[in-house]
A protein has these predicted regions:
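Intrinsically disordered, low-complexity cytosolic regulatory tails
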Residues: 61-63, 302, 332-343, 349-413
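Pre-DFG segment of protein kinase catalytic domains
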Residues: 235-238
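Activation segment
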Residues: 241-243, 271-276
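Protein kinase catalytic-loop region centered on the HRD/HxD motif
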Residues: 203-216
């Protein structure tokens, strides 16, 4: 009597008893489906991300390769563009009285901008087929090189048939002018200024060879390509012949040498082997010229005594101080002068591997240490005991430079 009747049980509307076997399987199926769907979604998402990243990397690599190709093809940040009428007005239409000098690629004129700024304008020769290549090479390097001992390029002008490069103006002209033009000028070049010039050129070479983003070989370093500011600080100029190397590259071979005899190393002049040691040879010649006040002669030049040979003979005899520029009188520190002469002789040794690097030279110039190696016989030695350079051999390179003017037409680039 306590249990409800079947009719009353139906009225209570109890839920039907679960069917345990089939219900459990259904829930598992739903759960498995959800998991598999989520897993598939995650897999697809990972695949899509991987594809996207791969494409991004590929694009970046292609852009990097394109950038490398552009860099190797000498692209550069475009310099300021000057108009031809502006530069004509600044230089008095390239008036002869504004002419500062002349080189293998053209003439240099002094100019004055409307704001009063003094400038130097190099007017490249229109007859030279190499003019545009030299201009492009110089602009490419100017966009990537910045140092207090390098001349700064301000801009360029390519209008009509003119190819003009605008530089900062340096009032003390070139080292060549101060050393060799007149006795009066040399008297104003005391030892302190000479030592400052030697040290500044060395620091400029250190930057070009080891510290800049490019490894640059100048290839035509000489006194006329060293300009001096109002404080007599030297600035290396004229990078028309310069060659940029990869950071891991130390030397190259050219078909024809291009530069100025008397400043070209023997391995470069005769074999076309160019390296940082070629520049160091040129630097050594300049150092000896600054110390002695005398110009080095070209090898094979008739009736000419090589400055390098004379300094070497005096050095071996212990009388090197006799080679000091007479215009200095006795107003110079003898030890420092002999130290510079020693460094110059180390740099002009015949074998490139014996010449010091720019970093070594900078260290030697700033150090009072005398523990330096003994220089061997210089290249192009023409002394009584050394094998003289024959005139016929030297003449094979005479077409490289004439009367100290750089020639580059013989070397295709």
């Amino acid at each position: 009597s306590i249990l409800p009747s079947p009719s009353s049980r139906a009225a209570l509307n109890y839920p039907p008893a679960p069917v345990h076997g089939k219900g459990r399987q259904s829930k598992r199926a739903v759960l498995a489906g959800a998991i598999s769907t989520g897993t598939l979604f995650l897999v697809l998402l990972v695949v899509l991300v991987c594809v996207y990243m791969k494409r991004t990397r590929t694009g970046a690599n292609e852009r990097a390769r394109d950038g490398a190709r552009e860099d190797s093809s000498n692209t550069y940040v475009s310099p300021e563009q000057f108009t031809l009428p502006l530069l004509r007005a600044a230089t008095g239409n390239f008036a002869p009285e504004n002419k500062l000098g002349e080189g293998g690629f053209g003439q240099v004129f002094k100019g004055k901008m409307p704001n009063g700024q003094a400038i130097a304008v190099k007017r490249l020769s229109q007859s030279s087929s190499q003019g545009f290549h030299e201009l492009k090479n110089e602009l490419v390097l100017a966009a990537k090189l910045r140092h207090r001992n390098l001349v700064q390029i301000l801009g360029v002008c390519l209008e009509e048939k003119e190819k003009l490069i605008v530089y900062e103006y340096l009032p003390n002209r070139s080292l060549d002018t101060l050393l060799f033009d007149s006795e009066r000028r040399r008297r104003g070049l005391d030892w302190r200024k000479r030592h400052t010039i030697i040290c500044g050129i060395a620091r400029g070479l250190l930057y070009l060879h080891e510290e800049s983003q490019l490894r640059v070989i100048h290839r035509d370093l000489k006194p006329s390509n060293v300009l001096l500011d109002e404080h007599m600080n030297p600035k290396i100029s004229d990078f028309g012949l310069a060659r940029a190397f990869r950071p891991d590259q130390s030397r190259d071979v050219t078909k024809r040498a291009a530069g100025t005899l008397g400043y070209m190393s023997p391995e470069y002049a005769y074999c076309g082997h160019v390296s940082v040691k070629s520049d160091m040879y040129s630097f050594g010649v300049i150092v000896l010229e600054v110390v002695t006040g005398r110009r080095n002669s070209s090898p094979g030049q008739d009736n000419a005594n090589s400055l390098l040979s004379e300094v070497w003979e005096k050095w071996r005899a212990g009388t090197a101080a006799e080679m000091a520029d007479a215009s200095l009188g006795d107003q110079y520190p003898r030890a420092q002068m002999l130290s510079c002469m020693h460094i110059g002789l180390l740099c002009v040794q015949k074998k490139p591997e014996l010449r010091p690097d720019a970093s070594e030279v900078v260290l030697m110039l700033s150090s009072q240490s005398r523990s330096r190696r003994t220089p061997s016989r210089p290249a192009f030695y023409a002394g009584s005991t050394g094998g003289a350079v024959t005139a016929s051999r030297a003449r094979r390179s005479e077409n490289v430079s004439k009367n100290g003017v750089t020639m580059s037409e013989l070397e295709p680039r």
